[in-house]
Amino acid sequence: MGCNSLSMIKVRLQNLFDNDEVALLKITCYTDKLILLTNALAKAAIHTIKLNGIVFIHVITSSEVCPDNNIVVKSNFTTMPILQNGGYIWELIELTHCSQLNGLMDDNCEIKFSKRLSDSVMTNYMNQISDLLGLDLNS
């Protein structure tokens, strides 16, 4: 029982912004409750925003199935409980090493978790998320 397995979950991202780019988002973590984590991601809403030429991704999960510290034993991301409906926005993710010479996204692209953004950049980012979701995140 208590044995945790290393699991990689892949989520295909299509139509990033206004083009036909396709990428594969890879989420790797140690968990002993992979079914719950998979279900949470299957029901997640994924939004992308381009900021200063970098593509950032928010994976938004329902509060009912959102992984917490009891599910995600070891990972490179945290949850940010800022949605008014009680859901969670997962930490910023930056796609790297994804561009091919033909301009399309590489299916084998890597992800890295972003460093903390400056307050001004974060404010700009959150305003874009707020507009995208129709939420007032400042209230």
UniProtKB/Swiss-Prot annotation:
Compartments where found: Host cytoplasm; Host mitochondrion; Host nucleus
Motif segment (DLNP): 136-139
InterPro entries per the UniProt record, alphabetical: Pneumo_NS1 (IPR005099)
GO biological process: symbiont-mediated perturbation of host apoptosis; symbiont-mediated suppression of host adaptive immune response; symbiont-mediated suppression of host cytoplasmic pattern recognition receptor signaling pathway via inhibition of IRF3 activity; symbiont-mediated suppression of host cytoplasmic pattern recognition receptor signaling pathway via inhibition of IRF7 activity; symbiont-mediated suppression of host cytoplasmic pattern recognition receptor signaling pathway via inhibition of MAVS activity; symbiont-mediated suppression of host cytoplasmic pattern recognition receptor signaling pathway via inhibition of RIG-I activity; symbiont-mediated suppression of host cytoplasmic pattern recognition receptor signaling pathway via inhibition of TBK1 activity; symbiont-mediated suppression of host JAK-STAT cascade via inhibition of STAT2 activity
Entry annotated with the keyword Cytoplasm: no
Keywords: Host cytoplasm, Host mitochondrion, Host nucleus, Host-virus interaction, Inhibition of host adaptive immune response by virus, Inhibition of host innate immune response by virus, Inhibition of host interferon signaling pathway by virus, Inhibition of host IRF3 by virus, Inhibition of host IRF7 by virus, Inhibition of host MAVS by virus, Inhibition of host RIG-I by virus, Inhibition of host RLR pathway by virus, Inhibition of host STAT2 by virus, Inhibition of host TBK1 by virus, Inhibition of host TLR pathway by virus, Interferon antiviral system evasion, Modulation of host cell apoptosis by virus, Viral immunoevasion
Domain of life: Viruses
One of the Pfam families matching this protein, by short name: Pneumo_NS1
One Gene Ontology term, aspect cellular component: host cell nucleus
Primary location recorded for the protein, binned into one broad class: host cell
Transmembrane parts of this sequence: none
Oligomer and partners: Monomer. Homomultimer. Heteromultimer with NS2. Interacts with the matrix protein M. Interacts with host ELOC and CUL2; this interaction allows NS1 to form an active E3 ligase with ELOC and CUL2. Interacts with host IRF3; this interaction leads to the disrupted association of IRF3 with CREBBP and thus reduced binding of IRF3 to the IFN-beta promoter. Interacts with host MAVS; this interaction prevents MAVS binding to RIGI and inhibits signaling pathway leading to interferon production. Interacts with host MAP1B/microtubule-associated protein 1B.
UniProt remark on domains: N-terminus is important for IKBKE/IKK-epsilon reduction. The DNLP motif has IFN suppressive functions like binding to host MAP1B.
Protein family: Belongs to the pneumovirus non-structural protein 1 family.
Function, as annotated: Plays a major role in antagonizing the type I IFN-mediated antiviral response by degrading or inhibiting multiple cellular factors required for either IFN induction or response pathways. Acts cooperatively with NS2 to repress activation and nuclear translocation of host IFN-regulatory factor IRF3. Also disrupts the association of IRF3 with CREBBP. Interacts with host mitochondrial-associated membrane (MAM) MAVS and prevents the interaction with RIGI. Interacts with TRIM25 to suppress TRIM25-mediated RIGI ubiquitination and thereby RIGI-MAVS interaction.
Protein name listed in UniProt: Non-structural protein 1
Protein's gene: 1C
